[in-house]
Amino acid sequence: GLGARIRSQVSIPGVGRVDLIIGERLVIEADGREWHEGGSAFHADRIRDLALLRLGYVVIRVSYPLIMSEWMLVELTVRALIGRREHLWSATHRREGLAR
């Protein structure tokens, strides 16, 4: 395992549902062509990413081909973020009222 709690389809106020949250603040969004390919959907996804970043979340957006063909790269990235404890709220986040 990753050594961190994984939750799926988590609702974040002001953003909506995200695909996964690892730990407290690492968001993984999986983009399939069916829902995320059109120009307006692509734009809406980036608006969501910016909202998540303003709230203090770390966002990784991965495509279906990345998940299916390059999973090791995705996992290495997630493990690196966990190793740096970026999946957890810091004391600074808590002081600034970002921790949820």
What label would you give each PLM region?
Residues 1-100:
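Surface segments flanking catalytic/ligand-binding clefts of nucleic-acid enzymes
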